Amino acid sequence: MKAVIFAYHDMGCQGVQAVLDAGYEIAAIFTHADNPAENTFFGSVSRLAAELGIPVYAPDNVNHPIWVDRIAEFAPDIIFSFYYRNLLSEEILHLAPAGAFNLHGSLLPAYRGRAPLNWVLVNGESETGVTLHRMVKRADAGEIVASQRVAIAQDDVALTLHHKLCQAARQLLNSILPTMKCGDIPSVPQRESDATYYGRRRPEDGLIDWHKPVSTVHNLVRAVAAPWPGAFSYNGSQKFTIWSSRICPDAQGALPGSVISVSPLRVACADGALEIITGQAGDGITVQGSQLAQTLGLVAGARLNRPPATSGKRRIRVLILGVNGFIGNHLTERLLNEENYEVYGMDIGSNAISRFLLHPRFHFVEGDISIHSEWIEYHVKKCDVVLPLVAIATPIEYTRNPLRVFELDFEENLRIIRYCVKYRKRVVFPSTSEVYGMCTDASFDEDKSNLIVGPVNKPRWIYSVSKQLLDRVIWAYGEKEGLRFTLFRPFNWMGPRLDSLNAARIGSSRAITQLILNLVEGTPIKLIDGGQQKRCFTDIRDGIEALFRIIVNEGDRCDGKIINIGNPDNEASIQELATLLLDSFDKHPLRCHFPPFAGFQVVESRSYYGKGYQDVAHRKPSIDNARRCLGWEPSIAMRDTVEETLDFFLRSVDVAERAS
């Protein structure tokens, strides 16, 4: 059986050797060129391939059509991926008749995504493992072929666990590869309800928060110990790294971050103390804890801290227009949780952001973007990243007020885009899933899918075409005048503070809010055209995390990109959403305070929205760009989102009733 292998790291070397030992013919190996900035402590797949006399390649983009054709020429019977860092396109996965298979460093479906080795230690797990699974379009989601468990000892650190996983991988492959070679390939579907996803880790994620439990801090030290970048803290402006530690249960009443003693070197955490066994000051050498204390000039009672605010770059200034809206207020919370962001915002109200008004890094002005143009231009010039989130985005308004939709959603936002061009500021612009219109693709691709809308006499498309035209204008400004931009397309984000029940009372709300209002008031749930339209519902927490990563823009990977942000796994019809909501409503502890359920009522869309409305049957995103550019994957199940959204609205009603 002929194989093409994609491999990197020690796991890649183990995989290549196991495939050879099982009697496969390896036609070619694809790997990565080593990054000079990375600590390459691991084995070289390219060197191993060269020593074995196997053709080896390291293309920048293995999914380019030229390389896909080249791989096809090898005519592989089977494809293996062993710690190859890039996702393989469906075109490549379909080249091998027997299929494509990936070795993942966890017990799937737990710990899908990046850096599972480190994450299991961060989370204090006692067991992990390796899994060989069939590769499908979605990362780490294919049927399981085989897995092997690995116990995590309390003294395991990243490197010792890495060696255990390599050994387990070799044992697993030695056992299953001969069976697969004979055509006997086990397939066990993964349980999506058990799936968890973790993103990439960065060196800065090693910053210690001394207010966490001591076990959490100790687990972080274990998870990123050498040769990984290490867990670190600061004494004044001096950074130091902790390479090994142990837990001491008694913090002696000291405040978190306080030095309890210097020999041994112990630091108080939330519920105990961390003893620093070895560490390193700055770029110095590794020394034992008491010597580290001496080098840093520590004394008992000293307080360790987060990186000083004056340690270099100023904070990143983010301008959010529409800051009081659903996305704006949740994004503000996420940004203010990071020390290096300052938020400037404008909106016509402040009810959703009242909790931030006294925050020292939040600056709010109540105003209208169509009136306060001077304030906006000044702050576009002042800030680093601009998010124009103001838009009319409820379907009934498209047919009620199409001209107002165009004036606000297109004309006012175009003025802001031109300010960004003028002052050369980066803009993160909210496009919409509506731009795909009546696209017939099974999933909507940002770079390939056609954008199809209905006739001119259907004003419901005014929002879609206004957003689409702005997308095209922004793209042209990027191509012709160097505007730095990212377009993101939310797919049916839901969560607390989505809109209001008052908006639902006048028909100007999202679907779930309207459904909740029906339950609260004891009126029939209206299913427009039977409620068979399908959407992919996305938890606001998943959406905001993706949007935050767009703002961070690691490696400038988001520049010039269009990125769908949605959850393809949470596809449901409006009727199914209503049924799930009703079930959650009946189980809610406040259910007894509301009227009986009044049933479902099928309503024709024309009578509800007017003659200018037209609906679409489905709207499912491809999220390959989000995975590739952001290292992001949605993880929150639709039921959890529905329950949390319902709880928010029911408790807000309860508070109002008690107040009256």
UniProtKB/Swiss-Prot annotation:
Q: Which GO terms describe its cellular component?
A: membrane
List the EC numbers from the record. Answer: 2.1.2.13, 1.1.1.305
Catalytic activity, reaction form: UDP-alpha-D-glucuronate + NAD(+) = UDP-beta-L-threo-pentopyranos-4-ulose + CO2 + NADH; UDP-4-amino-4-deoxy-beta-L-arabinose + (6R)-10-formyltetrahydrofolate = UDP-4-deoxy-4-formamido-beta-L-arabinose + (6S)-5,6,7,8-tetrahydrofolate + H(+)
> Where does the record place the site Raises pKa of active site His?
140
- State where NAD(+) binds: 347, 368-369
Q: What UniProt keywords apply to this chain's record, in alphabetical order?
A: Antibiotic resistance, Lipid A biosynthesis, Lipid biosynthesis, Lipid metabolism, Lipopolysaccharide biosynthesis, Multifunctional enzyme, NAD, Oxidoreductase, Transferase
User: Which positions in this protein are listed as binding UDP-alpha-D-glucuronate?
Assistant: 393, 398, 432-433, 460, 492, 526-535, 613
* Region annotation Dehydrogenase ArnADH: where it falls in the sequence: 314-660
| Site residues (Transition state stabilizer), renumbered to this chain | 102
**What are the positions of the active site?**
104, 434, 619
Residues covered by region (Formyltransferase ArnAFT): 1-304
Q: Which residues bind (6R)-10-formyltetrahydrofolate?
A: 114, 136-140
Q: Please, one GO biological process term?
A: lipopolysaccharide biosynthetic process
Pfam families from the UniProt entry: Epimerase (PF01370), Formyl_trans_C (PF02911), Formyl_trans_N (PF00551)
Q: In which pathway does it act?
A: Nucleotide-sugar biosynthesis; UDP-4-deoxy-4-formamido-beta-L-arabinose biosynthesis; UDP-4-deoxy-4-formamido-beta-L-arabinose from UDP-alpha-D-glucuronate: step 1/3; Nucleotide-sugar biosynthesis; UDP-4-deoxy-4-formamido-beta-L-arabinose biosynthesis; UDP-4-deoxy-4-formamido-beta-L-arabinose from UDP-alpha-D-glucuronate: step 3/3; Bacterial outer membrane biogenesis; lipopolysaccharide biosynthesis
A GO molecular function assigned to this protein is:
UDP-glucuronate dehydrogenase activity
The record describes its quaternary structure and partners as: Homohexamer, formed by a dimer of trimers.
Q: What does this protein do?
A: Bifunctional enzyme that catalyzes the oxidative decarboxylation of UDP-glucuronic acid (UDP-GlcUA) to UDP-4-keto-arabinose (UDP-Ara4O) and the addition of a formyl group to UDP-4-amino-4-deoxy-L-arabinose (UDP-L-Ara4N) to form UDP-L-4-formamido-arabinose (UDP-L-Ara4FN). The modified arabinose is attached to lipid A and is required for resistance to polymyxin and cationic antimicrobial peptides.
Q: Which family does it belong to?
A: In the N-terminal section; belongs to the Fmt family. UDP-L-Ara4N formyltransferase subfamily. In the C-terminal section; belongs to the NAD(P)-dependent epimerase/dehydratase family. UDP-glucuronic acid decarboxylase subfamily.
Listed name of the protein: Bifunctional polymyxin resistance protein ArnA
Organism of provenance:
Salmonella dublin (strain CT_02021853)
